[in-house]
């Protein structure tokens, strides 16, 4: 009986470290190396397909190559929703395997706050970088983003929950992830940029369900 209780305690402790719901305010996920394994799996509050969304987060990286920032895959479609940084000042959004790319001014080796919105009825895509809107584009008008998803940080999924490549991995710090099933107003996006998010209902950095896989650590955020 004592051995059984000890085993249950160890198993519970390991499970709680790997899969957690945590308030990560003023903290970051650190992805300290290139790899084809290190990632964080997110478990969203999402049971139905998406007609609209807003997704915001902060990154701090010295990578100059392309990298995956947010990978949302469903069975049969690896790039159902993907935010991909092509290079400094250039981002792509994939919806249902199709993509659009936006470009703007961005300072290298500085923290970045990124918000992306998409509205199905119009197809309009907006990128806000450090509180400033970039040129609007259109993508997949009247499309519906499928669910349930596999959501991964740190890697780009080439199949549902896997298919990672070192050359697409994110290296750096990741923080303040929030997601809504509607398009935020410009004023609300500025609130998010200033660290005052407005009731996120899909992903909430201050009550995040996540599972760490590989070499990813949590540290205080020491930059703004």
Curated annotation (Swiss-Prot):
Subunit-structure text: Homopentamer. Pentraxin (or pentaxin) have a discoid arrangement of 5 non-covalently bound subunits.
Domain Pentraxin (PTX) stretches: 25-224
Co-factor binding details: Binds 2 calcium ions per subunit.
Known glycosylation sites: 52
UniProt keyword list: Amyloid, Calcium, Disulfide bond, Glycoprotein, Lectin, Metal-binding, Secreted, Signal
Covalent S-S links between cysteines: 56-115
Database matches in SUPFAM superfamilies: Concanavalin A-like lectins/glucanases
Main location, first listed in the record: secreted
Signal peptide per UniProt: 1-20
Similarity field: Belongs to the pentraxin family.
A Pfam family of this chain: Pentaxin
GO cellular component, one term: extracellular space
MF terms in GO: calcium ion binding; carbohydrate binding; complement component C1q complex binding; identical protein binding; virion binding
Protein's UniProt name: Serum amyloid P-component
Compartments in which it is found: Secreted
Disease: SAP is a precursor of amyloid component P which is found in basement membrane and associated with amyloid deposits.
Names of required cofactors: Ca(2+)
Organism of provenance: Mus musculus
């Amino acid at each position: 009986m004592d051995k059984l209780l000890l085993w249950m305690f160890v198993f519970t402790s390991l499970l709680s470290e790997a899969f957690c719901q945590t308030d990560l305010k003023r903290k970051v996920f650190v992805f300290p190396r290139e790899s084809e394994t290190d990632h964080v799996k997110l478990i969203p509050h999402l049971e139905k397909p998406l007609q609209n969304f807003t997704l915001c987060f902060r990154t701090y990286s010295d990578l100059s190559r392309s990298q995956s920032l947010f990978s949302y895959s469903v069975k049969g479609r690896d790039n159902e929703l993907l935010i991909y940084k092509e290079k400094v000042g250039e981002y792509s959004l994939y919806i249902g395997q199709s993509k659009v790319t936006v470009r703007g001014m961005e300072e290298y080796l500085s923290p970045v706050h990124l918000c992306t919105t998409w509205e199905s009825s119009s197809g309009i895509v907006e990128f806000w970088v450090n509180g400033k809107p970039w040129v609007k584009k259109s993508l997949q008008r009247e499309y519906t983003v499928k669910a349930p998803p596999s959501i991964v940080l740190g890697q780009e999924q080439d199949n549902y929950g896997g298919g990672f490549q070192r050359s697409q991995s994110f290296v750096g710090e990741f923080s303040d992830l929030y997601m809504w099933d509607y398009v935020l107003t410009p004023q609300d996006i500025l609130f998010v940029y200033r660290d005052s998010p407005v009731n996120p209902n899909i992903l909430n950095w201050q009550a995040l369900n996540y599972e760490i896989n590989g070499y990813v650590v949590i540290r205080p955020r020491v930059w703004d």
